[in-house]
Structure formats: structure tokens, C-alpha cells
Amino acid sequence: KGGMVYLDGANLNALMGIAKPGHMGVDVLHMNLHKTFSTPHGGGGPGAGPVAVKRALSDYLPLPRVTRRGERFELEGNGPKSVGRVRSFFGSFGILVRAYAYILSLGGDGLEDASRMALLNANYIRKKLEKSYHLAYNEPCMHECIFTDRVQQRSGVTTLDIAKRLLETLPESQAQVA
């Protein structure tokens, strides 16, 4: 009692259009846009990670903030309780626009469909590979499943060997990106 809940929204593919973190008691949520909303990351950067908070925490968000006043959106630069600026200028604005365009292009139904496909794909691959790889958790999964190389280690095969082989099977153009 009295604590707050932080959700690492590194991958929201299983939740979009299906669940509302705020309704689950989440007070703070950060979103890594590259995993869920089709934006570049790493070598393809820059990355961006918007933060959503419950109203009680909004005074502490970094500046500047986009606020809605009636039908208009404005930049708010003052906030005595704010942590201040965490990045120069307006952050990775272009990445935010790209993620927003992706969200608009899919719409609510499309986001939900993407989540349902992520759930289906993860559980499909889990079932297809569970006899060949050690499944770390033997239960239905959300957007991803976790295997270990325990079975392959008996033959001297490591996770790195498996990763390299996966790259070798990619078409030339995709292998260079990976």
C-alpha cells in the first residue's frame, strides 16, 4: 500500500488495443517505440521512449510538455516540480512523429489485430520449437517465448552458434541489417 507501479513497456505488442495499463494499476509506463511502433533503433537510431503517467505524477514529467488546451495543443515550458529537460531541444521528435503516423495508419482495430498476431505468432513458434529446444517457461506466452540451449549444449552447440546459423539463413539484404 502506498507504492507505485512502473511498467517497462519495452514491448507492448501483446497489449495494444487489448489491455489498458492504467486499468491494471500501472502508474508509470515507458514505451520503447522501436519494438512496437516501427521506428529505427540502435545503428538505425535515434531511439525514443515516451513516458505516460497517471495524472498525480504529471507535474514531475520532463519539459517541455505538450499540453491540450481545448482544441489546441501547446508547448508548456514551466513546471516547478518537473525534473527539467532531459535532452536538448524537443527530443527525438521525428521518431515520435513516425510512431504516431504508424499508430494512425493502423487505427484502433489495426493495433488490436497486430497484438493478436503477436500473441498467435509467439505461441505458434513456441509449439513448433518446444521439442527441439528447452522451453524456459512451459506455459502460453504473450508476445515472445524463451528457449535455452540446454538441449543443444549436449552436442557442443551454443546459443552463439544458433544465432550465427540464423543469420546465415537470412537473405543477403536482411543479414546485413541484422
Regions found by a protein language model. Name each.
Residues 168-178:
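Conserved PLP cofactor-binding pocket of PLP-dependent enzymes
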Residues 2-4, 26, 36, 43-48, ...:
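Active-site lining segments that contact anionic ligands and/or coordinate catalytic metals
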Residues 82-83, 95-123, 153-156:
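Structural signature of PLP-dependent enzymes
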Residues 11-17, 65-79, 117-123, 138-148:
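A glycine-rich phosphate-binding loop feature that marks nucleotide/adenosyl-phosphate handling sites
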Residues 119, 124-126, 161-163:
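Flexible, glycine-rich loop/tail regions that form catalytic "lids" or insertion modules at the edges
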Residues 1-70, 157:
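Conserved PLP-enzyme active-site core in the AAT-like
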Residues 134-165:
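Conserved PLP-binding catalytic core of the aspartate aminotransferase-like
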Residues 44-46, 53-95, 150:
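Internal glycine-rich alpha/beta core junctions
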